[in-house]
C-alpha cells in the first residue's frame, strides 16, 4: 500500500544534501590529485616527488574538504535556526499579521481568498510555527542541511576519488605519466558522472560532458604550468 511516507522516500530529492557533498568531494579528489601530479610530473624526472606531492595533497585536501563542508553547512544551519527563532518571536508579538501573511502565501499558490484563510487558520491552530517555517521560510526536513553528514560524505569521497590517480602514480611509467594520468582521470570522471546521474536521477550524458570538460581544463592548465617552469626535480 502506498503511503505518503514510503512514496516520498522513493524520490531523489532526499539524497540531494549528501549526494552534492559526495559528488563534489569525489570530483575534487580525482581532479585535484591528478592535476597536482600532472603539474609535478611535467617538471620531474623521478617518481618520488610526484608521490610525495600527491599523498600530501590527498591528506590536506580530504581534511580541507571535510572542514570546509562542515563550516559551510553549519553556517547555513545557524542561519536557519536564527530565522526560526525570529519567526517564533513574531508569532507571539503579531499573530494576526502572521496569519494574514500565511493566508496570502496560499492565495498566491492558487487558493481562493476564503479557502486560503481557512487553511491558514487550521494550520495555525495545529502548528503555527511549523506552518510558517515550511511555507514562509521554505525550510523543511528534506532541505535542512546536516553538517556532520556533509563533512563525512565530502571528506570520504575526496579520499576515495584521490586514491584512483594515486594508483596510476605508483604503477605507471614516469615517462609520459601525464598522459596516463589524463586518460585514467577522464575514465574515472566518466564513471563518477554515471554514478552521480543514476543516483540523482539526472541525465547521464549531461553529467559526463560537464564533468569531463572541467576536468580536462584543470589538468591541461596544471600541465601547462609544469612545462612553463620546466624545472627538473
Task: Kindly give the residue locations of the regions a language model identified.
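Alpha-helical transmembrane spans of integral membrane proteins, capturing the lipid-embedded, hydrophobic core
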Residues: 57-58, 155, 159, 186, ...
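Juxtamembrane boundary at the C-terminal end of a transmembrane helix
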Residues: 223-233
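Structural signature of hydrophobic alpha-helical transmembrane segments
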Residues: 175-187
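Internal alpha-helical transmembrane segments
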Residues: 1-72
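Alpha-helical transmembrane segments of multipass membrane proteins
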Residues: 60, 64, 161, 165, ...
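Interfacial loop-to-transmembrane junctions
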Residues: 191-216
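Cytosol/matrix-facing amphipathic helices and coiled-coil assembly/linker segments
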Residues: 1-14, 73-155
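Transmembrane alpha-helical segments and their cytosolic interface motifs
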Residues: 18-37, 141-167
